[in-house]
């Protein structure tokens, strides 16, 4: 007894399902974007990405393997020359699914599945490296801040014992400044 395919069934038998996925993939590679049901788009996504990965390898065995699944030589040629070159720097994520609402008639949820042919922006990689570096630098900066805060605290304790009246005068000035700022903040609202 054959093991059933995981995921939603597309109707018909296993052979019909394989042919339907192959035809959807061929249409996707030919037109770069197709409109289909959400279920078919979700089943097509890993299938198409696997074929694009074969195309990125570019060797004869990969081409023959894809030709075994998609019988249209023109589509396979386009996949291996145009699409594989466009996604050469991308590590997966070659397709994008966008839901577009329900179909008139049977109210089936529809989606657009398209190839992501835009080049990967190096800015995204730089941002990821910068955030990693910032997270490593943040604990070191906190340690420096703690050390600098401890030194003034020791000096402040010595100064407080000698200049207690001066500290009270500074505190009174700080309170007066806060009361002046509070009405200004309320005016801004």
Swiss-Prot record:
Record keywords, A-Z: Ribonucleoprotein, Ribosomal protein
Domain of life here?
Bacteria
Molecular function (GO) terms for this protein are: structural constituent of ribosome
Q: Which organism is it from?
A: Paenarthrobacter aurescens (strain TC1)
Q: Which GO terms describe its cellular component?
A: cytosolic large ribosomal subunit
Give the matching PANTHER family: LARGE RIBOSOMAL SUBUNIT PROTEIN BL17M (PTHR14413:SF16), RIBOSOMAL PROTEIN L17 (PTHR14413)
Q: Which GO terms describe its biological process?
A: translation
Q: What is this protein called?
A: Large ribosomal subunit protein bL17
Region annotation Disordered: residue ranges? 136-189
